[in-house]
């Protein structure tokens, strides 16, 4: 069938066949299908959608467009965690070592940040010498010896997604649930982990702004993964304010390590326990209450922290930086944002907080931007807190040579106060399995 006819059928709301979807994906990857036809196809999908079967076929065609990573050389239950992206999200730095300390195998490939969301690889590279590029033998060895490894994605992993996402980004077709699900799951299923825990963020700092859309995305991704023979669970978590207190790179490493040493923010630790419980239910058959108890034990007795140190050492990082935070990159100047009135914090625009951190140099405005590892923010107050005039709302870690006024103004506008008390939303909104 001609590409024109496939586009027309989807435009008219008809269901596509597996060969038709395969033809579109293959043609776009090999260059025989031009951008303008792929853009038309994506817009047709955006408006007409795809059913579960079509979305699974699209995911599978994208998954097989490049390298597939076998984990046959790893002994034990391999599990991955994927977050749909948020602000202050250093979860992988803590969850991986926690699960490794409890006997699971975490073979994780992570990405870099862009825009208001940070990237796991960027945070780890705040540690001097830390290498996110391991060959296959080193990757397998790390998981077998330590139980956890975090590396960057290989160059030829799901090339279809790289090309399709770049086109979606400039054709206003990013926020399509079938296309989001296929993008995420094609990358996750290209690596042969036995289990996958999805952290689907919901709120102002997430791609999914409301719970209904997030739940629809979660259900679709769980079905795709299950159909592919994997164990998959999705946790829907609140991203109406940043996760934890720190936003940046080195500052988030510090908060992650503090959490591994059992002195992190309570809300962040509770998310770690929830995600870990889902992974342990898959891989160790534990109930949620049993799993959360065991997570508390490995945080309290230092086993999870020990796994993080082992991972850093294996991947070439300077362990002394973890043992002594003063060795990590640090900003030269500290400033604070103070309240100009009494009241209660009613709302924190999480996306704006992320953009403010990016403007300080903690993130990328473009894919070629250079990150300043030492700068960042600390949110001192949270939704529901009572505020007096002059109270510090946030701390800023700045370096000279950059106009920080835009970031400071953005931060000020992001934190809203009201005269009456507001009750903060719970962190865990739902679990889909």
Which stretches of residues belong to each language-model region?
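A glycine-rich helix N-cap at a beta->alpha junction
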Residues: 123-149, 219-225, 229
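Self-splicing inteins and homing endonuclease
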Residues: 60-83, 136-166
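Glycine/serine-rich anion-binding loops at beta->alpha junctions
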Residues: 77-100, 104-116
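Alpha-helix C-terminal capping segments
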Residues: 47, 93-105, 187-192, 227-228, ...
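Short beta-strand segments
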Residues: 109, 143, 151-153, 199-203, ...
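Acidic, glycine/proline-rich low-complexity segments that act as flexible tails and inter-domain linkers
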Residues: 1-88, 309-318, 430-433
């Amino acid at each position: 069938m001609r590409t024109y006819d496939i586009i027309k059928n989807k435009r008219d709301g008809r269901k596509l066949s597996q060969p038709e979807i395969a033809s579109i994906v293959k043609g776009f990857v090999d260059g025989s299908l031009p951008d303008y036809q792929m853009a038309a196809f994506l817009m047709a999908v955006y408006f007409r959608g795809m059913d579960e079967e079509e979305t699974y076929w699209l995911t599978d065609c994208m998954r097989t467009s490049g390298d597939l990573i076998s984990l046959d050389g790893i002994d034990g239950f391999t599990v991955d965690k994927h977050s749909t992206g948020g602000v202050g999200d250093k979860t992988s730095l803590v969850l991986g070592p926690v699960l490794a300390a409890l006997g699971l195998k975490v073979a994780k490939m992570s990405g870099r940040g862009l825009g208001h969301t940070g990237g796991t690889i960027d945070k780890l590279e705040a540690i001097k010498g830390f290498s996110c590029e391991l060959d296959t033998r080193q990757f397998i060895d790390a998981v077998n010896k330590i139980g956890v490894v975090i590396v960057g994605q290989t160059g030829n992993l799901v090339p279809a997604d790289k090309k399709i996402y770049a086109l979606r980004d400039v054709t206003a077709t990013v926020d399509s649930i079938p296309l989001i699900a296929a993008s995420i799951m094609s990358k996750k299923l290209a690596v042969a982990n036995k289990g996958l825990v999805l952290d689907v963020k919901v709120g102002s700092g997430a791609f999914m702004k409301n719970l209904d859309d997030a739940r629809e995305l979660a259900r679709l991704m769980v079905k795709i993964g299950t159909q592919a023979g994997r164990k998959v669970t999705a946790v829907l978590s609140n991203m109406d304010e940043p996760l934890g207190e720190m936003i940046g790179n080195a500052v988030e490493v510090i908060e992650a390590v503090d959490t591994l040493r059992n002195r992190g923010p309570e809300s962040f630790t509770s998310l770690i326990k929830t995600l870990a419980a889902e992974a342990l239910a898959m891989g160790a058959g534990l109930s949620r209450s049993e799993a959360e108890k065991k997570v508390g034990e490995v945080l309290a007795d230092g086993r999870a922290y020990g796994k993080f140190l082992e991972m850093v050492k294996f991947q070439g990082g300077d362990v002394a930086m973890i043992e002594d935070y003063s060795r990590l990159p640090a900003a030269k100047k500290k400033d604070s944002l103070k309240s100009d009135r009494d009241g209660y914090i009613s709302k924190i625009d999480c996306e704006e907080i992320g953009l403010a951190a990016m403007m300080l140099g903690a993130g990328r405005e473009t894919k070629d931007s250079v990150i300043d590892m030492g700068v960042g923010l600390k949110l001192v107050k949270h939704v529901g807190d009572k505020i007096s005039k002059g109270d510090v709302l946030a701390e800023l870690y700045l370096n000279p040579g950059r106009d920080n006024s835009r970031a400071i103004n953005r931060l000020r506008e992001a934190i809203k106060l009201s005269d009456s008390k507001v009750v903060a939303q719970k962190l865990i909104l739902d679990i889909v399995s």
